[in-house]
Swiss-Prot record:
UniProt pathway: Carbohydrate biosynthesis; 3-deoxy-D-manno-octulosonate biosynthesis; 3-deoxy-D-manno-octulosonate from D-ribulose 5-phosphate: step 2/3; Bacterial outer membrane biogenesis; lipopolysaccharide biosynthesis
GO cellular component: cytoplasm
One example of a Gene Ontology biological process annotation: keto-3-deoxy-D-manno-octulosonic acid biosynthetic process
Stated name of the protein: 2-dehydro-3-deoxyphosphooctonate aldolase
Enzyme class name: transferase
Locations listed in the record: Cytoplasm
Gene this protein is translated from: kdsA
Lineage of origin: Bacteria, Pseudomonadati, Thermodesulfobacteriota, Syntrophobacteria, Syntrophobacterales
Length: 288
């Protein structure tokens, strides 16, 4: 599997890593505070981390919902996070025209789940040569993502993360099939589990989406046990007052205890199954 380096941190399959931050940029000061919190929490545990936030949420449920500061102001804030806090940044792009300005600022470009089938966008992101995070669409089977990954690889870009974020289950609900973790791993890409969007209740509160925050930890633990290489966690200083995705975002005080637990699970999985894989390679003569 392809590991890659972003701003001095290795993201891939060898070390557990975290992508985290508020769903959307609400203001500069809060964004910097949460980025600093994430950096410090991960540094204490020696976990590579990437800060994520959006300058625009183009798929909000209601026309009246807050979307973000916009691309110009948002990228300026993300640039400040990268420069002042010193951690790599990730943001999502919603159209081909956004790719060029975003690539000048961020370390990883993300294709949103709803846009995973938009070939022009996927190819444009791949052509930047930047690392790409492909989020599995809620309406796609895990194996279908191999075709999305192929579009990026076709540009010559092999720095790809693929993220599981749940599957539509009837109306206003998502469910996670943990088989998707090993299935997505067959692609050769590091697999991320989006533990917070996976508990979202899309459109579940009428004019906005709901969420079941209490299940974030359980699903994150299950995903890492199933072989996820990293987790994606949205977090906020006051989730109940967040302007986007509050019901499924973690309060900051819950982040470090969860990361400690996930790191322990990851070590067990790595030490147990990594040793088994090496033993199989030795017995079959495939070890070099």
């Amino acid at each position: 599997m392809a590991d890659f380096e972003v701003l001095g941190q290795t993201v891939g399959t060898n070390r557990f890593f975290v992508i985290g931050g508020p769903c959307v940029i609400e203001n500069r000061d809060m964004t910097l505070r949460i980025a600093e919190f994430l950096r410090n929490a991960c540094a204490r545990l020696h976990i590579p981390c990437v800060f994520k936030s959006s300058y625009d949420k183009a798929n909000r449920t209601s026309i009246h919902s807050y979307r973000g500061p916009g691309i110009e102001e948002g990228l300026a804030i993300l640039s400040e996070v990268r420069r002042e806090i010193g951690i790599p940044v990730l943001t999502d792009v919603h159209g081909v025209s956004e790719v060029a300005p975003a690539k000048e600022v961020v370390d990883i470009l993300q294709v949103p789940a709803f846009l995973a089938r938009q070939t022009d966008l996927v190819v444009a992101v791949g052509l930047t040569g930047k690392p790409v995070n492909l989020k599995k669409a809620q309406f796609l089977a895990p194996r279908d993502m191999s075709l999305v990954i192929e579009k990026v690889r076709g540009t010559g870009n092999d720095k790809i993360l693929v993220t599981e974020r749940g599957t539509q289950f009837g109306y206003n609900n998502l469910v996670v099939d943990m088989r998707s973790i090993p299935i997505l791993s067959e692609s050769g890409c590091p697999v991320v589990f989006d533990a917070t969007h996976s508990v979202q209740l899309p459109g579940g509160q009428g004019t906005r989406s709901g969420g079941e925050r209490r299940y974030v930890a359980a699903l994150a633990c299950a995903a890492v046990a199933a072989g996820a290489h990293g987790v994606f966690l949205e977090m906020h200083e006051d989730p109940d007052r967040a302007l986007c995705d509050g019901p499924n975002s973690l309060p900051l005080e819950q982040v470090s205890p969860l990361l400690e637990k996930l790191l322990d699970i990851h070590r067990i999985v790595r030490d147990t199954y990594g040793a088994q894989d090496a033993d199989i390679e030795r017995k079959t003569g495939r070890e070099h």
